[in-house]
Amino acid sequence: MEGEEYDKILVLNFGSQYFHLIVKRLNNIKIFSETKDYGVELKDIKDMNIKGVILSGGPYSVTEAGSPHLKKEVFEYFLEKKIPIFGICYGMQEIAVQMNGEVKKSKTSEYGCTDVNILRNDNINNITYCRNFGDSSSAMDLYSNYKLMNETCCLFENIKSDITTVWMNHNDEVTKIPENFYLVSSSENCLICSIYNKEYNIYGVQYHPEVYESLDGELMFYNFAYNICKCKKQFDPIRYHELELKNIEKYKHDHYVIAAMSGGIDSTVAAAYTHKIFKERFFGIFIDNGLLRKNEAENVYTFLKSTFPDMNITKIDASENFLSNLQGVTDPEQKRKIIGKLFIEEFEKAVNNIDIDINKTFLLQGTLYPDIIESKCSKNLSDTIKTHHNVGGLPKNLKFKLFEPFKYLFKDDVKTLSRELNLPEEITNRHPFPGPGLAIRVIGEINKHKLNILREVDDIFINDLKQYGLYNQISQAFAVLLSSKSVGVRGDARSYDYVCVLRAVKTSSFMTANWYQIPYDILDKITTRILSEVKGVNRILYDVSSKPPATIEFE
């Protein structure tokens, strides 16, 4: 989306895994954001209609050699033009370094939810953790060397309390505030938690307001965009796909579209919109890789044919090819690469059986913006957690033109589009299922026996969640088969069977997540049923890990 008609917030990426959540926060308040890497050249931004700048967090230490920094001329341009700057975590530390402050390793690293005190001259006596920072016996002593404001900093305007809960994730902290900066918040373990410069309209926070666990995070972005940057012109991010579809419509008479269809919401909604344009020149391909859930291959194909009776859809059974190539493979990234490679090979074989001109063919993908960010930030800035199946497995010599109408949208945006299309609720509310399928839910080596055990466990778990009315309250739920076995008793005999883990999480973004507290009586019923009906399992565990430090999937 070009967005010239909108007031822009420039978001500069220092490699944060939460980077896309900044964009999402801005989308939520109808602000257009332009994203660039930290090393952007001045010539590339001077002609933009920039109303403000946000500096993201990142996995580096700002004081280490080779860590990412803004170009000096770019930072000085922001100061010269007095473009408001909002630094988040690493971004705040970058501001401190650029303006002759100091950053050092934290004595106490902070991770997760933390209460932050918003500071003013009239409320510092309420601070109770003074002795955490040396010998200060009172708040007056503690803050005597810092400039405090008489009024609440405008970044925190309309926050109802002087204490707000935020998401922390840092090892370093600012230890010396640059000259002419105010100290505007502190936490129990981080004295300099937020800073503000009135002359240049610069704001820095050590925490992550973009993460949904930061209770007043969206309000901070609203204050920055509308009250500080004075943005006025709004845009509707969910209409992005309309522009993409309009751009591709000119090809509908002499081009084709092919799509890998899984039955998931992203690929299904993308196919529904694109099929409306290309009609008989649209071809959907559903590949059964042998790694799907119980009866899923047949159920998905039947669903797609009944929902889109006029759509060309081909089903390919490639299960034996996938399973034979995965034999003996235990490393999860290797599994993903093998599956990605085989998928492309099978897909290309299927396409070659269709009478179309490959040079005039688009490959439709339901890639979402979080897919791109979580897999790999530009220039390897961000630590790669996992290769995403939509963006990690595509070959460099891809023969098709790539069409990704949802690449700047988020999951809830696609759900809105699904409802606009009146697609069945089973699609709109379907939990995410990874591209590599059960390959990354069977820990270690994969074989048919393990897959069948996992299918039965997962089927009982999901169906019971639906029966008890919990499924739609949960963001994602699934079962995992561990590689280890445990000793048990069946009847009077010893058993030595697999251990299964049940996982259910609640999340708004899938970048952070909390484990879902299934009522104990329901969890007991589900567990009892699994152990009674599924052979090969004698122990069930329930995962109570949040993300971070865990990821949602095990592999």
Curated annotation (Swiss-Prot):
Changing residue 113 to A: 2.9-fold decrease in affinity for ATP and 1.9-fold decrease in affinity for XMP. Changing residue 547 to L: 85 percent decrease in glutaminase activity. Pfam families: GATase, GMP_synt_C, NAD_synthase. GO terms for cellular component: cytosol. Changing residue 89 to A: Loss of glutaminase activity, however, glutamine binding is not affected. In presence of exogenous ammonia, the amination of XMP to produce GMP is normal. 2.3-fold decrease in affinity for ATP and 1.8-fold decrease in affinity for XMP. Pathway: Purine metabolism; GMP biosynthesis; GMP from XMP (L-Gln route): step 1/1. Disulfide bonds: none annotated. Changing residue 411 to L: 70 percent decrease in glutaminase activity. Loss of GMP formation. Residues 235-430 form the GMPS ATP-PPase domain. Optimum pH is 7.4 with glutamine as substrate. Optimum pH is 9.2 with NH4(+) as exogenous source of ammonia. Changing residue 539 to L: 85 percent decrease in glutaminase activity. Homodimer (via the GMPS ATP-PPase domain). The glutamine amidotransferase type-1 (GATase) domain hydrolyzes glutamine into glutamate and ammonia where ammonia is then use for the amination of adenyl-XMP intermediate. Upon binding of glutamine, the GATase domain undergoes a conformational change involving an 85 degree rotation, which is required for channeling ammonia from the GATase domain to the GMPS ATP-PPase domain. This is GMP synthase [glutamine-hydrolyzing]. It comes from Plasmodium falciparum (isolate 3D7). The gene is GMPS.
